[in-house]
Amino acid sequence: MTNQYMTKLYHDLLSNSPQTVTIDIPADMGTGQISQVVTKQGAVVSDWKMNYFSDMNVQGVSCEDYIQLLFCFNDGVSWNIADARQCVSIQKGESCIYRGHGKMEYLCYSGKTNFLFKNIKIPMPYFHKILSDYFEDSEIDAYEKKLLTGISKVSITPYMEHIFAELKDFTQYRGGLGYLFLESKVFELLSVYLSAVSYTHLTLP
């Protein structure tokens, strides 16, 4: 006989666990896949592993509702921003943080090139709440001035790589525990990243 309580509990745990959505690169275009998972607070954690048979031109609007952390673990890429005379690039071993600007971005993935990116998008209201909960006003002003008005780069550290390696373990937890573990790793990565940005670019009181 099936225990209905345990059956329902198991179903609830599964349905309330973080769900990873994976999209494969079309076979006629190349190899690889893009996967993402969303935390309870709306942060989006995604992996981009791609190798296209030929140059792939992509364009899209950078959403103003998020601040993004982009990590490049293999071949780099550059992109242009509409209405701006600037070209942004990121190379292997680099990462950058910036707020979406609501403008069109244009980039080209070179063919027969191995791309591996990890991306974390944090909703702006959530990001502001984190700053207000944990930092003094002077620190908040310094971070916002630097992070919300341009693009800051820092090198990927071994500890950042360690956090990403652990982040995948959220699948070992069911229900709310999975979300809690995932959120904790996003927090940990953000704290390490802000520390790197502050020591590299900011002079905080």
Where do the protein language model's features map onto the residues?
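Short, cationic low-complexity segments
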Residues: 96, 140-153
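Intrinsically disordered, low-complexity, positively charged segments
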Residues: 18-20
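Conserved small/polar residues in nucleotide/adenosyl-binding loops
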Residues: 200-205
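Alpha-helix initiation and N-capping motif
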Residues: 3-6, 124, 136-137, 160
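An amphipathic alpha-helical interaction segment
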Residues: 120-129, 148, 155-199
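Generic surface-pattern signal
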Residues: 11, 15, 132, 136, ...
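N-terminal regulatory/effector-sensing and dimerization cores
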Residues: 22-139
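Short Lys/Arg-enriched alpha/beta "domain-start" segment
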Residues: 1-15
